[in-house]
Amino acid sequence: MADRLSLHSHLTNEGGPLAKSISGNDEQSPIEGRAASSRSAQTSATHKEARAPRSDDHAIVSTDRHVLANDRIKGLARRTFNKHVLSEIGGFSGLFALDAERFPDPVLVASTDGVGSKLELAIQLGLHSSIGSDLVNHCVNDVAVQGATPLFFLDYFAAGHIDPDIVQQVISGLVDACKANACALLGGETAETPWLYGNTDYELAGFLTGVVSRPRLITGEAIREGDCLLGLPSNGLHTTGYSLALKLLLNTAGYRPEQYVNELGDKVGAALMRPHRSYLSPIRKLIQAEVVTGFSHITGGGLTENLPRILPRGLAAHVDLSAWDPPPLFTHLKKLGSLDHDEMFRTFNMGIGLVAVVPADLVKKARLTLTRMNERSIVLGRVIRKATPRIVYS
C-alpha cells in the first residue's frame, strides 16, 4: 500500500473535522446504547508487568488507560449476550452453549480475518467504528456461504499506545455488526505493544464461529454443469484491493480524501470507506427457498480466484462481461493504473460481493426471492465443463 509518509501528506487532520468532511456527517454516531458482549480481563504480558508496583509513572498511566479501555469494552460487549452465553466478563475464556435441538448433528464452522490496508486509511481518517463492522461482516460472510449461522465473535486489538476513546469506537463497530448479524461478542484481547506499533497505529483481527447441521452444510459439491452464476452487488472495495487503490488514488492521482471526484461521484474517502456488506440475510433466504448449490464470497483474489474455490473438479465458471457494468470506482482505478483485465479481476471484486450458484430451472425463483427483499441480482454466467482454466471471461 502507499507508505505512511505518502498517506500523512494527504491526511492532516486525524479523526476530527477531516473525518467529518469525508463522511459528510457533522458528528459521529453516539456510542451510548450500542450492543455488546463478554471480553476477557486478561492483558498482554506488558500490562501484567505494569500492574506490579513500580516507580515508573508511564507504566502506571499505561495500566490506567488499559483498565479504562477494558471497562468501556465491558459496557458495550455485555449487550450482545444471549441465553447461550454462559460466561461473565473477566474469565479466562468465553463459554457458549450450543443449541442442539436447533442444530442436530452440528458442524462448527470457523473463520478468522483482518481488514488489510483499509485499516491504515481508517486510522488516518479517525473513522474507527466502521472498521469494526468491516471485520465482523467479512467473517460472517465466510461462514454463511457454508450454510452456517454465526454464533460468536472474538477480537484481537493490539496498539502501540492504548487510547480508550479509539478502543471504544472500534469495539462499538464490532458490537453494532455483531448485533446486526445476531452473534455474541464473546471475548477479546487488548494488548499494548509499543515495540511493534507506532504511537497511533493498531492492528485488528477477528475470529468467528458458526454452526450448521451436517445435512445442510453447503460445500459446492452439488454444483453441476449448466448451473447459473447469480451475482449480488458489493457497495465498494469491501476489504480487498486497498494497497493498490490507495496508491492509485492518493499517490498517482494526488487526490485528497476529502476531495470530491467527478469520476467517482463521491468524495475519495467516502468511496473507500464504505463498510463491507453482510450477505447473511440474502444467503439465508436463498437457502430457505432451496434454490442454491453453492456460494462464493468475493474477497481477496476477486472473481478469478474465489469462484473456482467452490467448483467441483472438471467444472469451470464462464462469466459474461457484458452482464454488468462495474461501478465508477473500479473503472476509474483501471484508468489511473492502466490496469489490464486480469489484474482488475484478481485484485478487486468489480462490483460483485457474493455469487450464488443456482440450478438453471430455479433461477427465476431465486431472483424473485431476492427481489422481495429489495436485493438486486445479476446473471453473471454459468458453470461449464472445463478442466482448465477454472474461470473464463468473454
Give the label of every model feature segment.
Residues 100-101, 114-116, 209-213, 235-237, ...:
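Short, glycine-/Ser/Thr-/acidic-enriched flexible segments
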Residues 75-235:
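Glycine-rich phosphate/pyrophosphate-binding loop regions near the starts of catalytic domains
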Residues 2-39, 43-127, 175-184, 231, ...:
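Extreme N-terminal cap/leader segments of soluble proteins
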Residues 2-10, 19-23, 32, 39, ...:
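Glycine-/charge-enriched secondary-structure boundary and capping motifs
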Residues 112, 203, 216-264, 268, ...:
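Short, acidic (Asp/Glu-rich) active-site segment that either coordinates a divalent metal cofactor
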